[in-house]
Amino acid sequence: MSDTTAVLLRRGAVVTVSFDPVTGSEAAKVRPAVIVSNNTANAAAARSCGVVTVVPVTSNTARVHPFQVLLPAKATGLPRDSKAQAEQLRAVSVSRIRGAAGWLTSELMDELDEAIRVHLAL
């Protein structure tokens, strides 16, 4: 893991993640994802090649469910409007992170937190 990767491991960062191999309907391939784990856990993961919790992102925005969040390109740094899929929430090894892709605003992060609560019935 590079020093650059350690800097990227912040809650709200949009990073590019290599999700393969996957099973069934899991989000696959190299795609953006939002880091949602807390920064203390993220720092520990960076030191020990541990895991961070992410929400995968897709550019398929035809439907946005209550457990998903529309991510406008202008507000995130992504190349096109996308959506975060809280139903695909998962822990990934920091070794799967390929680089930076953008950031969520605090307002979008609040929406994503709510989408996670809806999905997990918290």
Go through each PLM region and give its residues.
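Conserved functional hotspots at enzyme active or ligand-binding sites that engage polyanionic ligands
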Residues: M1-L122
